[in-house]
Amino acid sequence: MPQPGETVCLIIPPSVFLLDERVFMTLGILKVAAVLEHAGVPVEVVDLSGIANFLEALKDHARKSPARIFGLTATTPQLPAATEVVTALREVRPDARTILGGPHITLVNAAYKRERSLGQDGRAVTAMRRLESLFDVLVAGDGEEAILPACAPGAPKLIDADDPRSPMFLDNARLT
């Protein structure tokens, strides 16, 4: 859980690979925002899709925002933009704590676990190390149960909510 009264800013990176970036609604991060709000955490949502000067818009918002915790979602094609976003964020807010969730880290984590179980250091291990160097916390799997622990001081580098043995794993009975 974030500190009492601490604002969390959730960021949707642009999808520059799409002809119309507003075609797909990003529901996962909005559900995460709802969980935070329900827990009494002040939330900002910054949707950078369709914004040509998205880095300047982000920097402007980050300079004025009371948030110290910034969470991003990213699909694999959004990762280059998410990388630019986190780099720009760190330029103007070196105090920021960054969290990455979404489909990309979920898939990278699954491939990483497989490679490690086989004793391999392949593309997934390289990708995981790169993400670990860019973000403070990585959330694999659904973020609804993982966001509060991810925002807590001293959160682990990886929160694996994609592991069926994890209490954060959302099975069909708990998926709402």
Residue spans for each PLM region:
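Acidic, low-complexity intrinsically disordered segments
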Residues: 2-176
